[in-house]
Amino acid sequence: MLKNINPTETQAWADLTAHFETAQDFNLSDLFAADAQRFDKFSATFGQDILVDFSKNLITEETMKKLFALAEQTELSSAITAMFSGEKINKTEGRSVLHTALRNRSNTPVMVDGEDVMPAVNAVLEKMKGFTERLISGEWKGYTGKEITDIVNIGIGGSDLGPYMVSEALAPYKTRLNMHFVSNVDGTHIVETLKPLNPETTLFLIASKTFTTQETMTNAHSARDWFLAEAGDQAHVAKHFAALSTNAQSVSEFGIDTDNMFEFWDWVGGRYSLWSAIGLSIALAVGFDNFIELLEGAHEVDKHFAETDLENNVPVILALIGLWYNNFHGAESESILPYDQYLHRFAAYFQQGNMESNGKCVDRNGNPVDYQTGPIIWGEPGTNGQHAFYQLIHQGTKLIPCDFIAPAISHNQVGDHHQKLMSNFFAQTEALAFGKTEETVKAEFAAAGKTEAEVAELVPFKVFEGNRPTNSILVKQVTPKTLGNLIAMYEHKIFVQGVIWNIFSFDQWGVELGKQLANQILPELADDKAVTSHDSSTNGLINAFKAFQA
């Protein structure tokens, strides 16, 4: 089980606090000038296809030594072992945390309550394989005998964000099937998705473990109504709907053949579920073999994370550097900036992955924390972000550590597009690290023939302080395997930080209160009676809503 250790009471935390008195004055230009081997010391490779450069961070070897000591004193290694061995580290829900078992390609036994879960995992994978191959090959026919051409995945949260992100990221591997994802309970989402589709050639995946999730089931019933308006016979539902669920009774009552129900387990958290049957949409989007490659890539990182000493462990290093900024430099957010359009949902995916996991204010003892926990995660693909928010990163008053991610080889070699993209990738981290001094600005103005008055007026606005920290993650090419590597790397980074912060990273009680209140409010919206049961603001909003609808 996880130990309950307040990180701020460790000797390592005290040492880091003292070290920060000097470290807050670190200057990246000076650090690089003082050490010609800095890149070699502060970069790591993962396999043959990923390079992680963390040299442009406000760290020294002494900083990292003290951060590793913090990991040791909060017993990170035993926590890693506890997770992989199936201990119920999700204590508030009494569950193991075993998304790693879903991609356990070495097939070593993983025990939960005395039972090896791997036979069940492999059985579901085999079932997914058969289903996927029948649909992609065209063997599976709709109710009029036509092949299925379009798949609509209906889910929300982890049942949507992961599959959607991966399907987009691996679009170069697309099968003949067209994928669509519906999540929002706003009717516009399902209506606009269905407009161009043909009920005869559309199959729906309903992704809800309990088959009771409000948003998902609302959309599922609307999808069934749309289908039956054309198909007529309720019996045809079985050829056009499948379920990713464990509630066989509700699935059957909906009209879905339980042979087309794919189960997963309570030790699979929603935001880690793309590796499970929830990933069926991924397998349909890119083919089952590529889905397995995705699992293989994640498993490679799992082995690295579980077996590598902390000092050479890439997810651990990334986690500790992030913690350094979050807890000592006072950074409130991190930006994930993929220079690959296919990865346009990567930041959004880990916005959920990180903020739902580590957005906690109570420690594992049930006490309020008096230190910062999870950061705000955000980002957009490059180079779009450069023309949107990089201004603040470069010259604003907030410290925002950034992860830059890019492939060396593009799937679309069009002219010199990729060279231009990558020139920006390299330039941004250089600019953020080293900036532009007043002397350089003055020299540029002088070379451009500016007058002294013009120079004096404009120089302050043209100076870049630099010293903005970044990680650069260079991938040979975005493939199913390297994407699996990347996702698992970030997953384990989140886990490491949660362990050190002494919080539970695998529950999400913060999403419950809003749902409870929404269920109370919903019946109040059914008529035009004035509502008085809430605070004055909520009453006023509900009554204004009713007035607008009248």
Curated annotation (Swiss-Prot):
GO terms for biological process: gluconeogenesis; glucose 6-phosphate metabolic process; glycolytic process. Transmembrane segments: none annotated. The gene is pgi. This is Glucose-6-phosphate isomerase. The active site is at 356 (proton donor), 387, 515. It is an enzyme of class 5 (isomerase). Keywords: Cytoplasm, Gluconeogenesis, Glycolysis, Isomerase. Belongs to the GPI family. Pfam families: PGI. Gene3D superfamilies: 1.10.1390.10, Glucose-6-phosphate isomerase like protein, domain 1.
